[in-house]
C-alpha cells in the first residue's frame, strides 16, 4: 500500500489523476469530522446584534428585615419574565452548538433525573429571581437527563440548536435543543 501511495506522489503526469483522486477522497472523509465539532456559544451570542440587552434582575437580600418577605415570596406565584418575546438570532437555527448554563428542571423522573429543563445563564433564574428574556433561555430535551441533586453547578449542553419558541409554567424560551451531550462546566 505504501509503495502504491509513493508511486501516486512520484509526480509523473500519468499518475497525477490518481493523486488528485486520493486527495479528494481524503477531504471527503475528513470534512464531516471538522463539521461535527460544535460551535461554542456564550449567552450574548443568542441576542441579535442591535437588540436591547436586558440586564438580569438579581436582587440580593442585604437587609435581614426583608427575610420574611423573601420567604413568603417562595410560595408566591412566579415573577414576571423580563422580556417573554425577545428577538432571537435566526442564523443559529440548525447549528450544532455547545452552551454553558444552569439547569432549571421542568420534569423530574421517579429516579430523580430531569429530562426536560430550561438552560439559563445564571443560577437561580426562574426560581429565586425573575426569568431572563426568552432569548436567554433554551428549552432542553434529554434522554439521559441530569440528577436533580447535581443542579447547583453549571453544565455544558451540546446539540442542534433550534430557533423555536416554547412556553412552560416557569418561563418562555426562544430556543430549543435536543441534548446530545451534558457534562459539568469547569473553569479553565
What kind of region is each of these model predictions?
Residues 2-9, 132-136:
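Charged/polar, low-hydrophobicity segments characteristic of intrinsically disordered regions
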Residues 4-22:
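Bacterial N-terminal signal peptides that target proteins for export
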Residues 22-28:
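Hydrophobic helical h-region of N-terminal Sec-dependent signal peptides
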Residues 30-32:
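N-terminal signal peptide c-region/cleavage motif recognized by signal peptidases
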Residues 35-188:
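OB-fold and OB-like single-stranded nucleic-acid-recognition modules
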Amino acid at each position: 500500500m505504501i509503495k502504491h501511495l509513493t508511486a501516486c506522489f512520484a509526480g509523473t503526469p500519468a499518475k497525477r489523476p490518481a493523486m488528485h483522486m486520493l486527495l479528494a477522497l481524503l477531504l471527503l472523509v475528513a470534512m464531516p469530522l471538522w463539521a461535527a465539532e460544535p460551535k461554542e456559544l456564550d449567552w450574548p451570542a443568542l441576542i441579535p446584534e442591535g437588540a436591547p440587552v436586558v440586564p438580569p434582575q438579581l436582587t440580593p437580600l442585604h437587609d435581614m428585615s426583608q427575610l420574611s418577605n423573601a420567604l413568603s415570596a417562595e410560595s408566591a406565584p412566579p415573577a414576571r419574565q423580563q422580556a417573554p418575546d425577545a428577538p432571537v438570532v435566526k442564523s443559529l437555527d440548525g447549528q450544532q452548538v455547545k452552551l454553558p448554563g444552569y439547569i432549571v428542571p421542568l420534569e423530574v423522573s421517579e429516579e430523580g433525573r430531569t429530562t426536560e429543563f430550561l438552560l439559563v445563564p445564571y443560577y437561580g433564574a426562574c426560581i429565586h429571581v425573575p426569568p431572563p428574556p426568552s432569548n436567554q433561555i433554551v428549552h432542553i430535551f434529554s434522554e439521559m437527563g441530569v440528577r436533580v441533586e447535581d443542579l447547583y453547578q453549571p453544565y455544558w449542553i451540546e446539540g442542534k440548536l433550534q430557533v423555536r419558541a416554547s412556553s412552560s409554567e416557569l418561563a418562555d424560551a426562544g430556543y430549543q435543543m435536543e441534548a446530545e451531550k451534558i457534562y459539568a462546566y469547569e473553569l479553565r
